[in-house]
UniProtKB/Swiss-Prot annotation:
Lumenal compartment residues: 19-188
Spans within the Cytoplasmic topological domain: 210-234
Segments traversing the membrane: 189-209
Keyword Phosphoprotein: no
Function: Involved in the export of PMA1, possibly through the monitoring or assisting of PMA1 folding and acquisition of competence to enter vesicles.
Keyword tags: Endoplasmic reticulum, Glycoprotein, Membrane, Protein transport, Signal, Transmembrane, Transmembrane helix, Transport
Membrane topology: Single-pass type I membrane protein
Protein's name in the database: Protein SOP4
UniProt-listed InterPro entries: Sop4
Similarity remark: Belongs to the SOP4 family.
Pfam families documented for this protein: SOP4
Taxonomic classification: Eukaryota, Fungi, Dikarya, Ascomycota, Saccharomycotina
Keyword Protein transport assigned: yes
Signal peptide: 1-18
């Protein structure tokens, strides 16, 4: 009878421990003097991705937003790997259309300790770097740890620049390319106009006043002959 009670108690403890293997991540966006209005809250989100080894068929993903106007947010009921000293890793991405936030990527670690408790760690994990320091490097760069209690703090770097969401897809030839380059420079445009005038003006004069045009050509030929004669006399 006693052995059956012990067996049932062990089974109950196992079930409780198995079902208790769920994690929670609490965070807060600290905007300092800036207020989190309803407009800002709808344009700010936090995405979570499970990486590394995972016990489920597919890695866990989730997106959450603010719980209140103080900037609190939470990921609850996260699946964790079973076993002593087993670790589960998540990566969190803060994103906002109004602010640039830091850190822009956070590595979160859940570790099952031998005493049955769950240890939560967080590290700043910037874009352009690996999730974990490479083991092949003699002196790998250590990730900077973050405070996780009572929450993980995400801070404001600065306001995001105004984004242009409307772009002209059919750009005119007068604003790009060789033609656009000439039209956008007053000196180049003046040179082109002068060249056109030198070519077109004699044609216009000949059409309007043939006698004057003939006189101009004769004068040009006379000056050319005088030039050659002066060179030959030397």
């Amino acid at each position: 009878m006693f052995s059956q009670i012990v067996l049932l108690l062990s089974a109950f403890i196992y079930v409780v421990s198995a079902t208790a293997r769920r994690g929670t991540i609490k965070g807060r966006l600290d905007l300092a003097a800036s207020n989190i209005t309803g407009f800002v809250s709808t344009r700010t989100s936090f995405k979570l991705y499970q990486i590394g080894n995972f016990s489920t068929e597919y890695p866990y993903t989730s997106t959450t937003m603010f719980q209140d106007d103080e900037g609190n947010f939470e990921f609850a009921n996260l699946p964790l790997n079973d076993g002593v000293n087993e670790t589960t890793y998540y990566v969190m991405y803060p994103a906002s259309m109004d602010f640039n936030l830091k850190p822009n990527r956070i590595l979160i670690e859940f570790k099952n300790l031998e005493n049955g408790t769950l240890q939560l760690n967080a590290f700043k994990n910037f874009f352009g770097r690996e999730y974990f320091p490479s083991k092949d490097i003699t002196y790998p760069e250590k990730l900077q740890s973050m405070k996780v209690h009572p929450y993980i703090t995400v801070e404001l770097l600065h306001k995001a620049p105004i984004r242009s969401y409307l772009q002209a897809r059919n750009v005119s030839i007068f604003s790009t390319g060789i033609v656009g380059n000439i039209l956008n420079s007053r000196w180049k445009l003046a040179g082109v106009i002068t060249l056109i005038a030198l070519v077109v003006f004699p044609i216009i004069v000949e059409k309007l006043d043939p006698e004057t045009a003939r006189a101009i050509r004769e004068e040009a030929k006379r000056k050319q002959r005088e030039k050659y004669a002066a060179v030959a006399s030397k």
